[in-house]
Amino acid sequence: MEVILLERIAKLGQMGETVKVRDGFARNYLLPLGKALRANASNKARFEAERSTLEARNLERKSEAQKVAESLDGKSFIIVRSAGETGQLYGSVAARDIVETLAAEGFNINRNQVDLNQPIKAIGLHTVTLHLHGEVDVAIEINVARSAEEAERQAKGESLTSADAIYGVDEDALKPEDFFNPEAEIESEEE
């Protein structure tokens, strides 16, 4: 099916272009969301008549998205979840959880704007891309930890998945006199 794009769509085309897409993609995504029109004579004439208003609306949306992107750029958000000793989460962090965290901070982001290939299933620092507009993307850092204290330690660069990070290091056990002495064992075998 041929459609006229009403906005820029990644890997498809720019606003105003006539492109050929699969019927299901057009019927289930592009047409219902108002991102495209069927490419026929009446819709082409309608698009040309409304082109200036569509371009103005697109520029307005883009400038709003750029303002949000500037305020989000480089920010880190903490999500606290239960996890095992190895850092594996009991559950996962999905796009919905990221949207809720951003909403708590005052950012209005939709779930479909979060680019998350798979749910996050381990503690640590994760970079997530937000598609705010067809031409505006921003990367944020999601800090998944077991507590706010661990999130601060993780942000400083500490690894929380090793046994030392979980249980702490016993400095007294590392003193040189407590290490294995091979000569002492040889003496006991000779007797």
Swiss-Prot record:
User: Which GO terms of the cellular component aspect does the record hold?
Assistant: ribonucleoprotein complex; ribosome
Q: Report if keyword Ribosomal protein is assigned.
A: yes
Q: Which InterPro entries match?
A: Ribosomal_bL9, Ribosomal_bL9/RNase_H1_N, Ribosomal_bL9_bac/chp, Ribosomal_bL9_C, Ribosomal_bL9_C_sf, Ribosomal_bL9_N, Ribosomal_bL9_N_sf
State the source organism's domain of life. Answer: Bacteria
Which GO biological process entries does UniProt record here?
translation
Q: GO: which molecular function terms? A: rRNA binding; structural constituent of ribosome
What are the record keywords, sorted?
A: Ribonucleoprotein, Ribosomal protein, RNA-binding, rRNA-binding
Q: Where is this region: Disordered?
A: 151-191
**Any S-S bridges, and between which cysteines?**
none
The record's function comment reads: Binds to the 23S rRNA.
**Hey, which family's this protein in?**
Belongs to the bacterial ribosomal protein bL9 family.
Its protein name is: Large ribosomal subunit protein bL9
Species the sequence originates in: Sinorhizobium medicae (strain WSM419) (Ensifer medicae)
